[in-house]
């Protein structure tokens, strides 16, 4: 039977529950344990697919095409494992399932209530996510005391006494504020948070204490006594130079000892040598490059979480610090690309939706192409390379994507009416289709061209597999004209254009897929690694 570790948060949000869960999972995995991960989101949205990146951060796409919380990305990057749609569910999904079952007569006339029906559905989903794993780590979004989280708290409380559950362990992540005027660390917020948990019926067995300052031994003992945990179960979580240093910090504090004791896991000795070596290269690299990151959601950098982490992964393997120079694409429209990208060693244009900042991205692409600067365009960043090339090389005045101009005389990017999904089924869509769930999502194969940059990046693989999240496609009508003018299609999937390159450019690649979704610290994505490697090599030649 599966054992469960539940991670909750107290005092306030954004304390790092996801990194905590991922770090514990990493140490357990490196100890030879089969670990599953689950993020529960108490919001009522069915999924984050239609939520603003500026409000929620990045939407992470799983291998099987689910639009999930960005913490699933943290789990994959830390544990070097691909998780599926069962690794994330929301209040919206729970209520939808219960209401649908009620409408179909599945409850045989019962009055549907939070207890037992909603809570029962939550428990069922947690157990399903745990199937096939030795341990399932469950992160509960939000903060203890939130109204939205109460049914989930009740569900994990009930699982303590479930005969089908072999063991449970509760981890509580909380804040230890430092009052500068008094020069003191304060434990009261944590004590009150633990008291709130106890009122619900949950007693945490471990406290992860987030703090800017180191916790003295006397303070740890006081915290342990007031929260009714053993002294070795108070784990200090200081601000780290890199999030990838957190598992190492936890290991130094012997975090696995109380977990192993409670869950009867035996002696655990995780092998973290390779991990530690990569972290040292992140913190103290030998080389440095400056990358111009052109985007539109710069008010919240979390909107590009997977991509910025993928650049860190690549840099670690090349012993290089990738300094990101953030460039708002709307500012390029005002000031020009040269003014904002002139000091950059390479240019990356990220994906996005909507026409805000599009012309600025096109100017950035032109700047990288004309000045022979290494360039990587992802999703919309690839689509706009076709638009830029059509306008400025082919002379197609007014060329555009129909996403931004339905009446363009040269629709370089168009809405494909039907496509084959992951199961091989034909999907139909139009511009009137609902926004939620109508994208091309998940992992698809891509056939690469021999001798191309992308074939070389993937070590000669003829067919690669990467994840997608987009609605529009490159229009094959203009393929011959583009290729005759020097822009070559180097990646295809069932007739769809997946990657393009430019003949007379040292390193220029546009990809329709999102390579960042498959990048991990120990196994960086090949196309992003090749991009950073080319940037470093060309910058060192100058």
UniProtKB/Swiss-Prot annotation:
InterPro entries from the UniProt entry: Class_I_gatase-like, CTP_synthase, CTP_synthase_N, GATASE, GATase1_CTP_Synthase, P-loop_NTPase
Residues that hold Mg(2+) according to the record: 71, 139
A GO term from the CC aspect: cytosol
Pathways per UniProt: Pyrimidine metabolism; CTP biosynthesis via de novo pathway; CTP from UDP: step 2/2
Domain Glutamine amidotransferase type-1: 290-541
Family from the record: Belongs to the CTP synthase family.
More info: CTPSs have evolved a hybrid strategy for distinguishing between UTP and CTP. The overlapping regions of the product feedback inhibitory and substrate sites recognize a common feature in both compounds, the triphosphate moiety. To differentiate isosteric substrate and product pyrimidine rings, an additional pocket far from the expected kinase/ligase catalytic site, specifically recognizes the cytosine and ribose portions of the product inhibitor.
The protein, known as: CTP synthase
